Amino acid sequence: MISIKGLSYSYFERQALEDVSLEVQAGEFLGLIGPNGSGKSTLLKCLCGILPPRRGEILLEGKPLKDYSRRGVAQRVAMVPQDSTFGLNFTAYEVVLLGRTPYLERMQLERTSDHEAVQKAMERTDCWDLKERRIWEISGGERQRVVIARALAQAPRVLLLDEPTAHLDIAHQAEVYELLGSLNRQEGLTILAVSHDLNLASEYCTRLALMEKGRIKAVGGKKDILVPGLLNEVYKQEVFVQASPVTGEPHVFLVPKRK
């Protein structure tokens, strides 16, 4: 689905990505983990065409990403940023309708098929009942479901999410990841999600990529990546890892630096 080969990107003098290579298979749920500033968000921005890589190549379905038009990329890859800003008077329906922009010509009005796609996306994310509510008056968890619905309205093959549960309480965190897991399992949607919550990533992702200082440190199964030695080295923090008594997936616990 996605092949990243020797990708590098820099913000002026600061190297954000350095020689990143990664294969993402169709239908997998890949979690991107790593410390702040390790390049996770920059990698997502390169994958959706927002940032052009300085070196290296990204292949989407076997074709160089740079050979797609902006519309072509948007019809295949949807991005859910960490923070989304909308006009205060937008309804939830109007926000999701923005996801149909890649399929419309300039000044073209939305067609019946576009409205059908919006309803389907909102029903899939269980936010159809919010369609007439203003985006500013709904809760954080509800707003995140609306933003994900907007991405799904693009009918993408790949969904990218940058910390989709940031600023949410544990109930809404679980709600968002249950939704993503369902989209991945039942519909085969390929998902790449940046997460600072290692335990949520462990429970819902099928594979993990650990980043450090702009590079891919390790890629593999959750039980191969979420191990004390590797996490201690990358995060510079002692951790304890134990299988969840409920699911058996590895869970990471902070070891306090108490004297």
Language-model segments: which ranges?
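Conserved ABC ATPase signature
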Residues: 134-138, 142
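Catalytic Walker B motif of ABC-type/P-loop ATPase nucleotide-binding domains
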Residues: 159-163
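Conserved ABC ATPase "signature" region
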Residues: 97, 112-130
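Helix-to-loop junction immediately C-terminal to a conserved catalytic motif
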Residues: 48
